[in-house]
Amino acid sequence: SAYKQKPLAVVFPENTQEVSKILAYCNQERIKVVPRGAGTGLSGGALPLMDSILLCLSKFNKIIDIDYKNKCVVVQPGVTNLSITQAVEEKGFYYAPDPSSQIACTIGGNVAENSGGVHSLKYGTTTNNLLGVEVVFMDGTISRLGGKTYDSEGYDLLGLITGSEGLL
């Protein structure tokens, strides 16, 4: 990339509470935050700004649960698409919104960009394959949107977050 900015700092939180504290501090001090997964996106959403903190989520790389009966996988945002597919392929499943960068790209980046690939025509993009997320807002508030069922009452806040490129 021709864009070469160094952020104020790069942080590697290891849990949601650390992310919450970092965001609350940055919000209070009016410091910009750029979330980053694997950095494979082409829109520039994960490029640091010189007056920002780069929030690297690469340590959030665990598959939490695989529920074959309900066709649901719970993962942290740093898990790669390929890791999800490899974890479920023995039962004939795969992660359908498969961008060409699936070897390196992470599910967190997919959510931020609403990514998709060749199977998206049939199965939809990330937003069509996502049941829920845990988000941390700039004030440090931790919230869960969605759940283990596709349809829920009220506004589609999950759809609003998906594809927001970390801006919300």
Spans of model-derived segments:
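Glycine-rich N-terminal segment of FAD-binding domains in flavoprotein oxidoreductases
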Residues: 1-60
